[in-house]
From Swiss-Prot:
It comes from Chlorobium luteolum (strain DSM 273 / BCRC 81028 / 2530). NCBIfam families: pheT_bact, YtpR. This is Phenylalanine--tRNA ligase beta subunit. CDD domains: tRNA_bind_bactPheRS (cd02796). Residues 40-153 form the tRNA-binding domain. It is an enzyme of class 6 (ligase). The keyword Ubl conjugation does not apply. Residues 710-802 form the FDX-ACB domain. Residues 400-476 form the B5 domain. Its EC number is 6.1.1.20. The gene is pheT.
Amino acid sequence: MKISVNWLKDFLPSFSPDITSLVEKLTFLGLEVEDVESTPLPDLRVVVGRVQSVALHPDADRLRICMVDTGLEEPLQIVCGAPNVAEGMLVPVATEGSRLTMQDGTSFVIKPSKIRGQRSFGMICAADELGLSADHSGVMELDSSYAVGEPFARYLDSDTVLDIAVTPNRPDVLSHLGIARELGSAPDAILFPEEAPLEFSADSPLVQVMDSGACPLYVGVIIRGVTVGPSPRWLSARLESIGLRPKNNIVDITNFILHALGQPLHAFDLQKLKGGRVIVRSDFSGSFTTLGAEQCTVEPGMPVICDTQMPVALAGVMGGLDSAVGEGTVDILLEAACFAPSAVRRSARKAGISSDSSYRFERGIDIRNVLPAARAAVALILETAGGTVGEATLQGDPSPALLVLPFRPRRANELLGTAIETDAMQAMLARIGFRTLALDEGVMQVEVPSCRIDVLQEIDLIEEVARLHGYDNIEASGRLAATYPASRTRPGYFPDFLRGVAVGLDFREVLTNPLIRREEAAPFGDGLVSVLNPISEGLEVLRPGLVPGMLKVIAHNIRHGNRDMRLFEVAHGFSVADPSGAAEQGPLGAYCEKEWLVLALTGNRYPRSWNQPPDRVDFYDAVGAAEMLLGKLNLLDKSAVNIYNENTVSIDLELTEGKKKRSQRAGRAMRLDSALLSQFGIEQDVFTVELDVSVLEMLYSPDVVYDPPSKFPAVQRDLSFILPGTVPVQSLVGLVRSSDPLIRDVSVFDVFERGSGGGGERSVGLSISIADHSGTLQEGRISEILRTVGVNAESKLGAVIRQV
C-alpha cells in the first residue's frame, strides 16, 4: 500500500517528519515499510505554457505542430504527438536545457531537434516525463491557477511515498486516515474532510437490500446536474502520487475517498439504471460486463448490485461497464456500503477479479465510517462537478454498538514483564481511539473503536499496549518466570498423555486438515457439517472423523514410496447431532463435536530384513495395539472386544455407576473395505482403531496398585473348551479369569474352527495360571478351581471342557 507523506499532512497539519524517523516509528508500530520513494521537483526550466495554436504535421498523421507561449517574446514551436493537445491548454513545457527525470528513473536533456523535417524547440510534458506518475496517456492539462512563464516546480511540493506492508488483521490502516491514526497524538488532532449535510430516508424505493447478511449497510445518494470532466490539479496530484491515473472528477473522487478514508465507493450513471433504482441480491445467475470490459459469470451466492433487469456491479468487487460514469453523465447514484468480508472474498475468488475495493472489503471495513465517507464524497463532487443533491437513502444500521472489553493493567504487566502505570496505559490506548469508560478495582472497561475489528479480547489490548510502549523499550528479564500454572489442567493434559502413549507404542503422529471434500467424507456418515464459506471448493465440509484424513496421508506416503506405516492422530470430528432434526439440540446446537484417537496400520509388520520374510500386519495387530494402549491407561481389565462383523470389532469398557455396572462403547477396530480404500487410491490393506477420548478420560485412573508376585510357585493348567461359534473367545477368557481370585492370568494358545462362516463350534485352548500368596497350592484346591471354571463356562456360555 502506497502512502504519500504530503497526503498525511491533510490529516495531521503539524506533521513534519524526518523520513528516517518516520520509517522507524512505523516499523516499531508493526507496519513494515518495504520501500521509500522520493519525488524530486522538476527542473526549473520546465515552465507553464499556453498552447496558442495546433496544426497538423505535413509528414506525419499522428504529430502536431504547436505554437506555445512560455512568457518569452516569441512563442516556441514544439512538435507534439499527444492525442489530447489542444489550443488554449495550459501545459508544462520543458524548454531547451531542461533535464527531465522519468518515472522509471531514466533522464535526458531537452535540445532543439528536427522531427520529420520540422523544428522543435522544447517538449510539452506528460506526467511520467516529469516523474510525477506513470501516466503517459497524454500531456498534462493544468488549470487556470497556473501562470504562464512561471516554473512548474513552484506549484508542486516535493513528496515522499512509502510502500507499507499491511498484515491481514489490520484493515484499519489501509488508508491515509488509518496511518494518521497510528501516528497522531490523539484522535481529536486528526482533521477529517469536509462533509456535506445530508438527510437520509430509510424507506426509500431507491435501494432494496434483499440479502442483509451480505450487505448490512447500504447508502445511496442521487446527485443531479453534475458536469463530468478532468479533476482539479490537487486531486489529480494526490492520486498520481500513489501511482493512480486520473480519469474524471467523479471517478477520481471515489478513488480519493478510498485511499484517504479507507471506504470504497462507486458511482453509477443514474440514466443507465433500468427503473432508476438498485437491488442488492445474492440469488442472481447470469453474466455481466465489468468496467474492465470482461465478461463475469455470476452464480447464486455471489452478491450483486442490480437494477430492475440486470446486474450493474459485482458487490464490493467491481462495477459494470453498462452503468459506468462517462462524459455524457448528468445524474449519478453514489454508493457507499458495507459488504460482508466472506461474501466479497467468495465473489472475487470465483470471478477471478481483485480490486482495491475487494482488497479492503475482504479484510473488513469500519461500518461507522460509511456515512462520513459518503458525506465527504458528496461535498467533493458538489465542489468539483457541481450539481445538487437529490434523494439520499440508507438501509441498515450505520452505528452499531461498540465492543467493550475488560482490561487488567496488572495482567498486562505480568505478561509483558513491564511496570507501566495504569494512567500511562490508559493514555496509550486513548491515543489510538480506545476510550476508558470505567476503572474499578484494577479493571478498566475499554471501548474499542469501530475501525479496530481485530481487537476482540483482553490479550489484544495487551498487545496494543506493548506495541505503543515499544517492543524495544521492554527490557529483557534476568530470569524466566512462568505466568501459567505449574501443572496443566487435566482436560488439556489428557490428549497429550495419549499422544505420549501412542508414540511409546511406535506410532507416528500426523496432523490433518479438519476441512475435506464432500466426496471423501460421504462414506463415513450422513450428518455432514457443511461450511457456509469454504476457503476452496475442495474444503467444503468438516470431517466426520479422523479416518478420511488418515487415508489421505497414507495414500500420499504410498505414492512417495513409503508403504509401511503405523500412524496416529488425536483431533476432533464433527457431525450434525441429528440429521433428521427430530432430537433436542445439545450444547453445540444442532452439531456434535467429539475428540478421537485413531491408530492406523498398513504394510509390513517389521522392517525389511535379510533374516526374516516379509510379514504383513493384520486385523489382530490393530486389536493388539488397542489392547496395549488400554493397558497403558489401566483399562485393559475393564475392556471387552466384541465381534461386530468379520472386519470390525467393538471395544467396550466397563462403567460403574453406584452399585450397577454397564458397558460403555469406547470405539472400534476394523479392516477398511477395499472399495473405500480404492477411492483414496490405496491398494493394500489398512487397519484402524478409533477410540473416543472422552470415554477414555472418564474411566482413566492414574493410580496404580502394586500387586507383588506370590512367594509360592504358580501352577499352570491347560484346558480345551468346545465353544459355540457365536460366543466371542474374549467372553470365555473374561469368564475364566473372574471365576476365582487365585487365577492370575488366562491366555489363548489354540483356536480350531469346526464350522465355516462363524456359526459352527470352535475348540479353544486356554492356559490358566493359578497362584496363592498365602501358601503352596494343594491339588485339591486346584481341582476345585478348575471345576468352578468348567461349571461357569457351561452354565453361562454353553462352553464344555473337551475331554482328551
